[in-house]
C-alpha cells in the first residue's frame, strides 16, 4: 500500500490523530464514571446548581457530570473543548414514559426465576443515574460522541443476573441500539444470540417478517426464554430456536440464500465483541443475498478505526514492518486518507482478515 501526502495533508493527519486521542480520552472518562459512581449526581445536587446559576436541569446535570469527570473547564482549554465538543452534545435527559410504552415492556411480564446461577429479575436505575443510552455518534470530523442518558425518576427494567453480575437486560440502550436492525428486518430472518428476546419479540410483531430463526448455544438461555418469555409472545408461531454455535450455523446453514436478513448480537461490549464481529463479517461472503446487521456496530468500527489509523500512520512515516499487507488502494490526499477511516469503508475492511 502506498501513502504519499503533501506536507499540508500530513499536518492534517497529525491533527486527526489528536481527535482520535481525544475520542479515547473521553471514552475513558465516561467509562470510569459509569463504573465507579454512575449515581453520584442526585436531585439535590441538580436543584442546588439550577438555583444558583439559573440554568436548566439538563444543563445543570451536564455541568455536574463534567466536574465529576475531573475536567477543569475554567482553566484548562483542552478540558473546556472536551466538555463542549463531546460531553455537552452527548448527555440527554430521557422521558421514562417513552420507554415504558415500548411494546416489549407492555406485553412481557418478567417473573422472579432461577436457573442454576442465573436469576431472572427486575433491576433499577436511580433518579439521575447516568447510563449509556445509545451507540456512539461519529461526526464528519470523526469525533466519537458517547451517548449518556438519565431519568428524573426511578426506572425499572428486566435483567438476567449471573450471581451478582448483570448478564443481559432490556434497557434504553438495548432499545435504541436495536431500532435500525429491527426496522430493516423483513422476510426470513435469522438472529444470532437470543438474550431476553427483545429483538425476537419486536421483529416477530412485524407483518413483513415471515419467519425468525434464533441461533443460541446456551441451553440455560434457551430454557429461560422458552419457559418465561416466549409464551407471552403474540406471534410465537413465527419463531424457531436452534441450539448451535453461531459460526457453525453461518458457515453450514446459510449458503443457499434462504435468509433475507441476519442480526448478530453475540457480545456484551466492544472488548469481547470486536474479534467476534470480524469473524462473522468474514462469513458474510457465504451469504451474498442476506443483509447483515450487527449490534453496536458503530462502537465496534471505532475500535477498527483506531487500529487502521495507526497502521496507516506507520506507512506514512515509513515505519511499517516488512511484509505489511496491502489493505488499501494508494492514498495521495487527506480526503482519501479520511475516507478509509469512515464507517462505509471500515465495514468492507472488517471481514477481509487484513487487519
Regions found by a protein language model. Give the residues of each.
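A short acidic, amphipathic alpha-helical/loop segment
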Residues: 202-203, 252-254, 276-282
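S-adenosyl-L-methionine
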Residues: 218-261, 269
Amino acid at each position: 500500500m502506498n501513502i504519499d501526502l503533501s506536507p499540508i495533508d500530513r499536518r492534517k493527519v497529525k491533527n486527526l490523530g489528536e481527535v482520535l486521542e481525544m475520542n479515547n480520552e473521553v471514552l475513558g472518562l465516561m467509562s470510569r464514571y459509569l463504573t465507579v459512581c454512575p449515581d453520584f449526581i442526585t436531585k439535590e445536587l441538580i436543584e442546588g446548581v439550577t438555583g444558583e446559576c439559573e440554568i436548566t436541569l439538563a444543563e445543570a446535570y451536564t455541568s455536574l457530570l463534567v466536574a465529576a469527570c475531573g475536567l477543569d473547564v475554567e482553566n484548562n482549554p483542552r478540558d473546556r473543548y472536551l466538555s463542549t465538543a463531546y460531553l455537552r452534545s452527548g448527555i440527554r435527559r430521557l422521558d421514562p414514559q417513552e420507554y415504558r410504552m415500548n411494546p416489549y415492556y407492555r406485553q412481557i411480564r418478567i417473573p422472579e426465576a432461577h436457573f442454576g446461577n442465573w436469576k431472572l429479575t427486575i433491576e433499577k436505575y436511580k433518579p439521575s443515574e447516568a447510563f449509556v443510552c445509545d451507540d456512539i455518534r461519529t461526526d464528519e470530523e470523526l469525533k466519537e460522541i458517547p451517548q449518556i442518558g438519565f431519568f428524573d425518576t426511578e426506572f425499572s427494567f428486566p435483567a438476567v443476573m449471573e450471581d451478582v453480575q448483570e448478564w443481559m437486560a432490556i434497557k434504553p440502550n438495548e432499545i435504541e441500539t436495536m431500532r435500525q436492525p429491527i426496522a430493516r428486518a423483513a422476510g426470513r430472518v435469522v438472529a444470532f444470540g437470543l438474550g431476553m428476546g427483545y429483538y425476537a419479540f419486536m421483529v416477530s410483531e412485524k407483518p413483513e417478517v415471515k419467519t425468525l430463526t434464533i441461533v443460541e448455544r446456551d441451553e440455560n438461555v434457551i430454557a429461560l426464554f422458552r419457559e418465561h418469555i416466549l409464551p407471552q409472545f403474540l406471534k410465537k408461531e413465527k419463531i424457531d430456536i436452534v441450539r448451535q454455535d453461531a459460526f457453525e450455523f453461518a458457515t453450514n446453514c446459510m449458503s443457499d440464500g434462504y435468509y433475507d436478513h441476519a442480526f448478530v448480537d453475540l457480545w456484551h461490549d466492544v472488548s469481547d465483541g470486536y474479534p467476534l464481529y470480524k469473524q462473522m463479517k468474514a462469513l458474510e461472503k457465504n451469504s451474498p443475498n442476506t443483509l447483515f446487521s450487527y449490534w453496536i456496530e458503530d462502537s465496534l468500527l471505532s475500535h477498527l478505526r483506531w487500529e487502521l489509523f495507526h497502521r496507516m500512520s506507520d506507512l506514512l512515516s515509513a515505519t511499517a514492518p516488512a511484509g505489511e499487507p496491502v489493505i488499501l488502494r494508494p492514498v495521495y490526499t487527506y480526503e482519501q486518507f479520511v475516507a478509509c477511516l469512515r464507517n462505509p469503508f471500515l465495514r468492507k475492511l472488517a471481514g477481509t482478515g487484513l487487519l
